[in-house]
């Protein structure tokens, strides 16, 4: 009896050691739908948020963001990321609305599962990579921002944060957006380290993520997420970072 207990104990120890060493497995395809990423302000699970603020309101029936997060998404230098949109003078309102909508999509959407990837970052454990943004949404973003000013083409890193919010690094000159982003694809693909990849598909195709949609017509991104979850080799679900 004693030797049997010893064997069982050894097996348990080996199993525990193996489990501790085993890497976290990628999300199963069934886990790619209706999910929130493990990031700084996201809820653990999506659900109704009836009072989401202004541009974030399309996600009120099913959201990964809280009401407070949606309010902060509309503020300059908000507590979310202390990001200053006006780092090269005042950003045009028509341009800023795209960045607010971009923030709402990132914080609130439960339909980004096929593009969620693990990262080893202090402020988040997951990010999105290569989200296929509808070409019209990318085009209008670029058109409305091309006459605003910035000093960098990658806004994820390289800022001067000594003041508590982002400022242009030394020797980084302010130029119009179309200097740093000469094409719509340059803007959408590069500004957030390839979080987006501008799609050849159009809005309503069921093959690209819409940053803007009419909630009274339903959320078109649900169909898009389902398609890429079921077709992981379709070309818009990158396999690594």
From Swiss-Prot:
One Gene Ontology MF term: folic acid binding
Glycosylation sites: 68, 160
Signal peptide span: 1-19
Membrane topology term: Lipid-anchor; GPI-anchor; GPI-like-anchor
Residues engaged in binding folate: 102, 106, 123-127, 156-161, 195
Subcellular compartments: Cell membrane; Apical cell membrane; Basolateral cell membrane; Secreted
Post-translational modification summary for this protein: The secreted form is derived from the membrane-bound form either by cleavage of the GPI anchor, or/and by proteolysis catalyzed by a metalloprotease.
Gene that this polypeptide is encoded by: FOLR1
Membrane spanning stretches: none
Protein name: Folate receptor alpha
Prosegment location in residue numbers: 235-241
GO biological process, one term: folic acid transport
Keywords: Cell membrane, Cytoplasmic vesicle, Disulfide bond, Endosome, Folate-binding, Glycoprotein, GPI-anchor, Lipoprotein, Membrane, Milk protein, Receptor, Secreted, Signal, Transport
Keyword Glycosyltransferase belongs to the record: no
General function of this protein: Binds to folate and reduced folic acid derivatives and mediates delivery of 5-methyltetrahydrofolate and folate analogs into the interior of cells. Has high affinity for folate and folic acid analogs at neutral pH. Exposure to slightly acidic pH after receptor endocytosis triggers a conformation change that strongly reduces its affinity for folates and mediates their release. Required for normal embryonic development and normal cell proliferation.
S-S bridge residues: 36-64, 56-104, 65-108, 88-174, 95-145, 134-208, 138-188, 151-168
Expressed in which tissues: Detected in milk (at protein level).
Gene Ontology, cellular component aspect: apical plasma membrane; basolateral plasma membrane; clathrin-coated vesicle; endosome; external side of plasma membrane; extracellular region
Entry annotated with the keyword Disulfide bond: yes
A UniProt-annotated Pfam family: Folate_rec
Annotated lipid attachment (GPI-anchor amidated serine): 234
Similarity comment text for this entry: Belongs to the folate receptor family.
